[in-house]
């Protein structure tokens, strides 16, 4: 087994272990630390054994934003005397996955292996979500959500929704490519569109059952990017439009949506919320509460009418985070110190009307994340850290756009990669997917693959 293949299989095993980390079985965070150690040690041994430093040197376009991110994190820790340098291990693990993904991209079979693992993993997670929905889960509930929400293997329905939203664009891109290649494929490969058709149904259904509104919006945008990219390739004469298979896929997705539209996806103790009601409640993302005439209210805090408690809490967290940013806008409060600093800024708002609309859990919780990756980075690492991250993202997007123009036979998969990146960036506006062990690892490995995709790999498939 070659080095690329070995590292590829090591990542697949890591992804599988992180996916199947049911809260009732073992800790996903603990396993993540062990896997990062194993992958890091294997990577170090590979560097020492091969001794071809040029082979592992990151391109300049990728190296400089990475350097800015590292510099900003280190600077934030230096200027905050009580900061904890041990927090850097998370950033180091993310950059390790980016580096390994960049190097693995030179082996097309490894890229196929990783892409297939993500899609199959998404289908398995979706299937388990269906089992929970039908009350066929063989394992006891081990999360605070109990039987109120569908979480599959995860501890939080938003984590499930994000993972499936990432798997969906890859599965869709693979299905479109398989349909286009079917007339020219071998006998066994002709069944690939049917297999992917089933996998897409499981992923899509599981995503709906997660009832994660942020993941729904992000996943929809990711799929629209892949669909729009397919039409773009058709317009340029690079592929053909196969209407009958597309109609079949559209019918499948509509059928699943109709099946679940009136079924409860949030079993609130006071009221079960159907999927259609959950979709309609997405409007509260832009208006979680209304301000009433305080002269007509009887008690403090009654001057605000809350439409959605969860989103209302997010808005409060963002307000606290903005206060944290204002206090240290340039160097930040210290990488990895968000939760440690949050309580002081939260308590400073105790007399404000918005604070009084929160339930007692939200009023006392020291949340570890800002539920917005961009604000979180700015609060911890300062403006330099945010600019470094945005530069890294811009470089990734630029690489995808250049690849779509230069590599016609890889274009659909690059559209799929763009869809996944879009899912993560959009969901990062209202959640913290980059901090999740499995979801974040997939993003960084994929980002590295996008950079390292060799122009000689003209044929890639899931």
How should these model regions be labeled?
Residues 1-86, 95-120, 141, 173-197, ...:
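Transmembrane signal-anchor hairpin modules in multi-pass inner-membrane enzymes, especially those
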Residues 9-15, 195-201, 368, 372, ...:
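Loop-to-helix entry and N-terminal half of a specific, functionally important transmembrane alpha helix
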Residues 16-26, 374-381, 413-451:
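Membrane helix-loop boundary segments at the extracytoplasmic
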Residues 22-32, 82-86, 129, 155-158, ...:
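Helix-loop-helix junctions and helix-breaking kinks within/between transmembrane helices
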Residues 30-46, 88-98, 160-168, 217-224, ...:
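Membrane-embedded alpha-helical segments of multi-pass membrane proteins
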Residues 70-77, 110-141, 155, 159-161, ...:
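Hydrophobic alpha-helical transmembrane segments
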Residues 137-154, 267-320, 324, 335-379:
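Interfacial juxtamembrane loops and adjacent helix segments
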Residues 229, 383-415:
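Hydrophobic transmembrane alpha-helices and their immediate junctions
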């Amino acid at each position: 087994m070659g080095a690329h293949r070995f590292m590829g299989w090591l990542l697949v095993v890591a992804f599988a272990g992180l996916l199947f980390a049911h809260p009732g079985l073992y800790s996903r965070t603990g396993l993540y630390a062990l896997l990062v150690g194993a992958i890091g040690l294997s990577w170090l041994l590979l560097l020492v054994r091969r001794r071809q430093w040029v082979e592992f040197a990151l391109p300049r376009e990728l190296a400089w934003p990475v350097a800015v991110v590292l510099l900003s994190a280190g600077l934030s820790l230096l200027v905050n005397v009580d900061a904890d340098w041990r927090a850097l291990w998370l950033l180091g693990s993310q950059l390790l996955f980016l580096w390994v993904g960049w190097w693995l991209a030179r082996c097309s079979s490894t890229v196929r292996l990783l892409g297939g693992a993500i899609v199959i993993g998404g289908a398995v997670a979706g299937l388990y979500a269906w089992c929970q929905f039908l009350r066929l889960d063989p394992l006891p509930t081990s999360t605070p959500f109990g039987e109120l929400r569908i979480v599959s293997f995860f501890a939080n329905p938003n984590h499930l929704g994000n993972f499936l939203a990432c798997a969906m664009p890859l599965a869709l891109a693979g299905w479109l490519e398989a349909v286009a290649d079917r007339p020219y494929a071998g006998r066994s490969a002709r069944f690939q569109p049917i297999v992917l058709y089933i996998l897409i149904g499981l992923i899509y259904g599981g995503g709906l059952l997660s009832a994660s509104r942020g993941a729904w919006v992000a996943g929809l945008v990711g799929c629209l990017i892949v669909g729009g990219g397919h039409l773009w390739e058709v317009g340029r004469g690079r592929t053909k439009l196969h209407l009958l298979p597309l109609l079949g896929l559209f019918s499948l997705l509509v059928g699943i949506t109709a099946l679940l539209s009136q079924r409860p996806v949030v079993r609130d103790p006071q009221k079960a919320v159907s999927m259609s009601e959950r979709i309609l409640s997405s409007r509260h993302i832009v208006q979680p509460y209304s301000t009433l005439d305080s002269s007509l209210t009887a008690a403090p805090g009654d001057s605000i009418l809350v439409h959605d408690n969860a989103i209302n809490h997010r808005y409060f967290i963002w307000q606290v985070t903005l206060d944290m940013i204002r206090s240290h806008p340039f160097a930040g409060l210290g990488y990895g110190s968000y939760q440690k600093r949050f309580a002081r800024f939260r308590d400073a708002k105790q007399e404000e009307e918005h604070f009084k609309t929160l339930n007692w859990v939200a009023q006392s919780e020291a949340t570890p994340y800002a539920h917005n990756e961009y604000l979180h980075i700015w609060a911890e690492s300062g403006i330099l850290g945010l600019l470094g991250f945005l530069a890294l993202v811009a470089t990734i997007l630029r690489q995808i756009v250049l690849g779509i123009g230069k590599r016609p036979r890889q274009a659909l998969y690059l559209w799929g990669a763009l869809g996944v990146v879009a899912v993560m960036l959009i969901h990062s506006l209202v959640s913290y997917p980059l901090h999740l062990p499995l979801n974040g690892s997939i993003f960084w490995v994929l980002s590295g693959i996008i950079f390292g995709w060799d122009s000689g790999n003209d044929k890639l498939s899931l």
